[in-house]
A protein has these predicted regions:
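Non-Sec secretion/translocation targeting segments of pathogen effectors
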Residues: 1-13, 209
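Active-site-flanking segments in enzyme catalytic domains
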Residues: 16, 22-57, 66-239
Length: 239
């Protein structure tokens, strides 16, 4: 759930990484209690730098959300979608997609295009892709803690997005108020993704995840709703 979208179809070959680089990220993952299902990394198809950046993103969230420490169980680079940068589920797993397969040059070029077009938040970089996915992991944890089902996508995020929006504009009547959509779309186009979302006007879990990456990259220069979501998410996590 929560695939991080990418819209270019460019590819790129890699040179085989040195075994020492692989050993370093493997040691770091082991220290963090994370299983690496990245066999292709050893075959030169996955850049160890990407794995290291993923681990750094996880540690960033652990630092700011201590309740998440140890929640990520594995990183998988073998079964991730080739149509999204990455994805996350409610089972403590993170999956590499395009993020693990594109060359560094092609990944940077694609990401810059996504940012210029407004598809992803301004000021963000490819290295923060898994910050977005950790936003989904936080929601999964809160869903499980508060409602008994990690996979109830939208349950927690809809509440957080609405509370955050009302901090900005107390006159907002509900999640379907056009003013909420306007605030969310100011973060990015992906923050108001349409799709399978049941009772929600859009995929509000993507609003939350995009806000997490926006704030982690831009701090108090992030969009107003991103700042409010980050603050509300931290408040909720401290319950």
């Amino acid at each position: 759930m929560g695939g991080r979208g990418g819209r270019s179809h460019g590819g790129g070959s890699r040179t085989a990484p040195q075994s020492s680089r692989y050993d370093a990220v493997e040691r770091l993952a082991r220290q963090m209690g994370i299983y690496l299902n990245v066999g292709s990394l050893q075959r030169g198809n996955i850049n160890p730098i990407y794995v290291n950046e993923t681990l750094n993103s996880i540690q960033y969230i652990y630092t700011h959300f201590p309740i998440m420490t140890g929640r990520v169980q594995y990183i998988d680079a073998e079964t991730g979608s080739s149509r999204a940068y990455a994805s996350a589920g409610g089972d403590g797993g993170l999956h590499m997609g395009l993020y693990g397969r594109l060359s560094e040059r092609d990944l940077q070029r694609q990401w810059e295009w996504d940012v210029r077009s407004g598809f992803h938040p301004q000021g963000t970089k490819p290295s923060g892709i898994f910050i977005h996915e950790m936003g989904h992991q936080i929601e999964a944890y809160l869903n499980a803690r508060d409602y008994g089902n990690a996979w109830s996508w939208g349950k927690t995020s809809s509440e957080i997005v609405l509370r955050a929006a009302r901090k900005i504009d107390p006159t907002i009547t509900g999640l379907r108020d056009p003013k909420v959509y306007a605030l969310a779309s100011d973060i990015s186009c992906y923050a108001v993704s349409k799709g399978s979302h049941g009772q929600y006007p859009w995929q509000v879990w993507e609003t939350l995840a995009e806000a997490v990456q926006d704030f982690s990259s831009n701090d108090m220069n992030a969009k107003p709703l991103s700042i409010a979501i980050w603050e509300e998410l931290k408040r909720r996590a401290r319950r």
